[in-house]
Amino acid sequence: MILVRNIRLPLSAGEPQAFEKALHAARIPRGKVQHLGVAKLSVDARHGQPKLVYTVAVTLKEPAEEAAFAARCGDASLQQKVDFSVQNGIQPLAHRPVVCGLGPAGLFAALLLARQGYQPIVLERGPALDERVKAVEHFSATGELDVNANIQFGEGGAGTFSDGKLTTRIGDELCGFVTEVFLQHGAPEEIAWKQKPHVGTDLLRGVITSIRKEIEALGGEVHFNTALTGFEQKNGQLTGIFTTNGTFACEALVFAVGHSARDTCGMLMDGGLQLECKPFSVGFRAEHLQSEIEKSLYHEAAGHPALPRGEYQLSQHVGERCVYTFCMCPGGQVVASASEEGRVVTNGMSFHARNGKNANAAVVVSVGGKDFADDPRRAIAFQRELEARAYAAGRSAGEYAAPAENIQSFLEGRGQLNIGRVQPTYDRGVAAADLGALLPQELAETLRAGLRAYERKIAGYTAPEAILTGLETRTSSPVRLKREENFECTQLAGLYPCGEGAGYAGGIMSAAVDGLRVARAIISRYAPAEG
């Protein structure tokens, strides 16, 4: 297959024009073509006149001719499909492998193990997705929190209640395998070619359930409402685990508990395993009118049907720290994401259509080990303290209401909330608060400097009607459980730290890829348990 890149067209053009321009650029006669398709589509909104930028995939009737044609065009290259395969190992497993956590990392680790005949046992502290959705909706309506069934815990992990983004910077060939699995299980076809693919929380739920059912159909077992509580080991080798629903003998455990399993991290440290601090970030969730964001990004072309919903990604270095936007949700809403009683956490979510009035994104500042004397317990305690402050600051508006403030007020330290055209979407309600007072002064001032810089990049970002809701604290895990090159824990053989909670991923795609890497390491070493 030949990929012809950088096919730039006006918004009024479509696929036929892209195909013709690609063939002309690569000097490929139409009669030699077997198939034409869109491999990637993005928008270049620079210079005030947005352009569609296509990468066109060309398959010739005679594959042997593709290399010669690809060499004729500087924007063309030959691409060979890389099939992902793994060979089963020979060291016998006495027991079936166990996967702890059914977020993206655990889900894809379990899927690969199941497809290779290992019949994994999967443990998830939260409920199945249908029950989880009911618990989330109940919390949104009443403020009654289930600490094991919420936006953080349950089938699918935290990413289930998000925008369903599949973007990543890791550049791993396994990303293609993840996309293929999503497509096999009902994700929209556009995720294969959009520059910034997303599934949306509404469609993602069905995809996750379908993948889990494939695991079960291949002999895997899924135990919901089952939390990991301890380990059993002998001479530095894992021999079994303790859970809230009994014990499981195992010598291979995929530890993929997610970034909010603080009690599990505490159990590891209490049991003698050493965790290390890793960088994470804290801040707020910013809301603007989606239409205003698109006017700033697309100018006169805003609203054109060929354009996707406008989204942005901003960053600004302020001294030794970085202020950046995270998990931007066009046409989305801010959701109550607490998983511990008496603490408020924000996150963003949007449906596939992204048709809400508001745009939202986390605006956060980086923190790291030096802020906590490289003590992982202090890093976790810092998150908890901020969330407790947010709970107290918002409580006047109801249980798990969130503190909020206009961006201009935050910049000036006034603690005021005037609701105009931008209606806050946080589902438990908001209360006016001085958000700067909830953070250490240095972090608050750094965020202010970052926001002022954003105004120079997106006009109107700090407009008086724009709103901040807080606090955003779960951007990633604050800790890492170290592992060797073979993906085993450095301190306990048979334990395989995996995904975002263990400190090795950030987002759905990278977590899924890490799950595949860990599963591949287990498969390459071991043969399936007999019986």
Residue ranges of predicted features:
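Residues forming the flavin
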Residues: 1-50, 56-161, 165-185, 189-531
